[in-house]
Regions:
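Residues forming the flavin
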Residues: 1-629, 635, 640, 652-665, ...
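Short Gly/aromatic-enriched secondary-structure transition segments
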Residues: 647-649
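Thiamine diphosphate
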Residues: 667-677
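C-terminal functional segments of enzyme domains
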Residues: 730-760
Length: 760
């Protein structure tokens, strides 16, 4: 049996199915006929009906696939044939090179295939029948079409994702026209089907990260910086005087070597430089850190440099392309950006990925159709399950004659991986992702369970049922006006809650027909399996850290934390009661909202310290030759990609703006804004974040918005005009809007005149 899955089609369903499977320990080939995997999304601005930014919603999927060595992305590639049996299939594919050279054939060994091909709107052309590509694909897959032009189902149980050929599953547009949210759910369900089939081979032959032996680097070591400048593609390499830029960069403090390279992304120049052991910091100048930072961090790690000692300077999208009409001006700005990059990399410290052991079992609350389907699917994926249900729910499942439900009771009773808790109710939950401690109130003695994930499939099995129950409070659950639990991660994650490791499906989230309820449960099983398929989880070290010496226990940071990662701790220190914030490393997402609320510098985010922001601001303004000078803070999720979008489209805007990337707009402390204006002499400060409702940190942009009033009052105290500070919501697709905002703010600041606090 082969631990590989071939996913046909890299649309939203294909990417989601692929991302699910690589997280669960499978190798994935993501095959796309077109030249790029996100090809159609450039034409989509916002998603209906939630009005989410399409590019912002897509970004996490792209990063998951780009940054996972077990995801093999095959673009400009078509399937020619599929032979063999489920678990041991051979797929022949044709990868196109160009029109003159033709293509090259390749044979892939896979255990299963997920068909996630999309659909296109009719262009008014004449066709013999709709779905004109389906017949050819069906023949290559060894399938037949039904009278509606869809793939024939497995006749044994009529499951909508199972085709007549075992080991070949279908989701997305392959099922017909379907809404985005439903397509995502079906993609997760299809992934669970493939994972169940290939359980015996899971994790076999995976590309595992090599054990790193990084050069020892201490924070106090004098920086020895190597700089690699990527010349870029033909459209950018002549827009900057790169020789002049390299000479200038060589003169900056701590820079010991600068190299120009035609393409830094292959990693060879980085490995040659860093591999000598002569350098303890690295700057890659050229590509955007989104989505390239993960790639260059891997190159750094392969050369034995801690990946968090890397800084990226965005010359292509945020300098060359947006100032292409004036090469000299663009080159001067590039020098400033390099200076800012050096200022930041000098302050970086080596960090280690965080690894936590987890409990590889799942609690499913509710014996609804979705709950039972979820429990059965998890068990078939090799994961231990505790199913909390009631006698009426069990009876209803047993009495059903529906072909999808009828086999479920027997599968439950025959599985060694499922423990059913009948007529029990979940009273409370403590802990967090990977290690929840749950109390069951059941006939006889109460029972305490330890699980790694929780799936809600019904509201009926929750003690005290209504809003405000201990479980709802501990898991931060919220109900809508109809009494269903609200999923809070947007249309791309209908089954996810704000609290990581807790998922929503079936009767807990909405009313569903039987077939859809089964898919909902299977999809939730896939989401939980992404956590539970490994005995440990690895998290980014870019999280908050409490400075006990500075923290006075004011608790200003506690309530604003969107993940409830902070609590107040009291203890006796030197015969006195000491209060200090205590931090949960597992649940922290590094948004920095806590850092921006602290008046005493008692907490900071690793890799994004306040001092680093301040130093970059000083450097940007010290080297600035353009007036008025604008410091622009952009969040990584939406606004920074939005600025990149302006570069991709070649939209011009004034070179007076210098962009500084932050994790979230909510991490920018008001003092940074005021200091930039009153001490460093910026003419204006622009803070760009996600649109409300699209914030990865849930509330970060709302916190930033709430602080604008305080910033306005501080500006008034310093006799500065309110126009010198501006907050804007920029989606990842809104490059035109970003450029327009820069134009408008530059005009406003020009009318106001120079900042009176500018000492130069």
């Amino acid at each position: 049996m082969t631990n590989s899955v071939l996913v046909l089609g890299a649309g939203i369903a294909g990417m989601r199915a692929a991302a699910e499977l690589v997280q669960q320990g499978f190798e994935v080939y993501l095959l796309e006929k077109k030249s790029r995997i996100d090809n159609n999304w450039e034409s989509i601005d916002h998603l209906f009906p939630t009005d989410e930014c399409a590019a912002c919603s897509l970004q996490p999927l792209l990063l998951e696939l780009f940054n996972n060595a077990n995801a093999k992305i095959l673009t400009s590639t078509e399937l020619l044939s599929l032979r063999g049996q489920a678990g041991d299939l051979t797929a022949e594919v044709l990868k196109e090179k160009d029109e003159d050279k033709g293509g090259s054939k390749e044979v892939l060994s896979v255990g299963a295939v997920i068909v996630a091909t999309g659909q296109e709107e009719d262009k008014g052309e004449t066709h013999e029948h709709l779905g004109y590509g389906m017949q050819a694909l069906a023949e290559r897959l060894g399938l037949e079409l039904d009278d509606k032009g869809n793939f024939k189902r497995d006749l044994e149980n009529g499951h909508p994702l199972l085709t007549a050929r075992k080991g070949v599953f279908v989701c997305g547009g392959g099922l017909g026209p379907i809404k985005i949210g439903e397509s995502v759910v079906r993609a997760c369900a299809a992934a669970s089907q493939a994972a169940s089939l290939l359980v015996p081979a899971k994790r076999n032959g995976l590309t595992k990260p090599e054990e790193n032996h990084f050069f020892p680097v201490k924070a106090e070591d004098e920086p020895r910086i190597a700089v690699v400048i990527d010349q870029g593609d033909a459209d950018v390499k002549d827009l900057l005087d790169l020789d002049e830029l390299a000479t200038y960069t060589q003169s900056l403090p701590g820079v010991e070597q600068v190299e120009l390279t035609a393409r830094a992304s292959d990693g060879s120049s980085i490995k040659d430089l860093i591999g000598t052991g002569d350098f303890n910091r690295l700057i890659v100048a050229g590509p955007s850190p989104i989505p390239h930072e993960g790639l260059f961090q891997r190159h750094a790690a392969e050369a034995d440099l801690n990946p968090y000692l890397l800084e990226m300077v965005n010359l292509h999208n945020q300098c060359a392309r947006v100032h292409s009409s004036d090469r000299k001006q663009a080159t001067e700005k590039a020098k400033t950006l390099m200076n800012m990059g050096v200022a930041r990399v000098r302050q970086l410290e080596p960090l280690e990925e965080l690894k936590f052991d987890i409990t590889q079992s799942c609690l499913v609350i509710g014996g609804s159709i979705s709950g039972v389907a979820c429990a059965v699917r998890l068990a078939e994926m090799g994961i231990n399950v505790h199913l909390v249900t009631s006698s009426p729910e069990q009876e209803k499942i047993r009495e059903s004659d529906h072909p999808l439900i009828k086999p479920l009771p027997a599968k439950l009773s025959n599985s060694e991986n499922v423990i059913v808790h009948t007529d029990a109710a979940v009273e409370d939950s403590q802990g967090c992702l990977g290690n929840f401690i749950v109390t069951l109130n059941q006939p006889g003695e109460p029972e305490t369970l330890k699980v790694g994930a929780i799936v809600l499939a019904s509201a009926m099995s929750i003690e005290k049922g209504g809003d405000g129950s201990p479980l709802e409070e501990s898991l931060a659950l919220e109900k809508d006006s109809d009494g269903f639990y609200k999923s809070t991660q947007g249309i791309m994650n209908l089954l996810d809650f704000t609290t990581e490791g807790v998922f929503n499906c079936g009767a807990a989230r909405t009313a569903l027909e039987i077939e859809v309820a089964v898919l909902d449960g299977e999809a939730a099983a896939s989401r939980a399996a992404c956590i539970l398929s490994s005995p440990s989880i690895t998290r980014s070290p870019v999280i908050s850290l409490v400075v006990n010496e500075n923290c006075d226990g004011c608790a200003y940071c506690i309530d604003p934390c969107p993940t409830r990662s902070l609590t107040l701790l009291e203890y006796v220190h030197r015969s006195a009661v000491k209060k200090v914030a205590e931090h949960n490393k597992v649940t922290c997402i590094g948004c920095g909202i806590c850092m921006s609320t602290c008046p005493k510098k008692g907490i900071f985010v690793k890799h994004f310290r306040l001092e680093t922001f301040s130093e970059m601001v000083k450097t940007a303004l010290k080297a600035s030759d353009f007036q008025p000078s604008i410091i622009c803070f952009c969040c990584s999720r939406c606004a920074y990609p939005g600025a990149d979008a302006a570069g991709s489209m070649g939209i011009q805007y004034p070179a007076s703006v210098k962009i500084i990337r932050s994790v979230c707009s909510g991490m920018i402390h008001p003092n940074i804004v005021i200091d930039a204006l009153t001490q460093d002499g910026a003419d204006g400060v622009l803070l760009c974040g996600c649109h409300p409702g699209n914030c990865r940190s849930r509330e970060g942009v709302l916190k930033a918005q709430a602080r604008t009033e305080a910033i306005d009052l501080m500006l008034e105290d310093f006799a500065l005009e309110p126009e010198r500070f501006r907050l804007e919501f920029i989606a990842a697709s809104e490059g035109k809007k970003f450029a327009k905002v820069i134009e408008e703010m530059t005009e406003e600041l020009s009318a106001l005149g120079p900042n009176p606090y500018n000492k130069t």
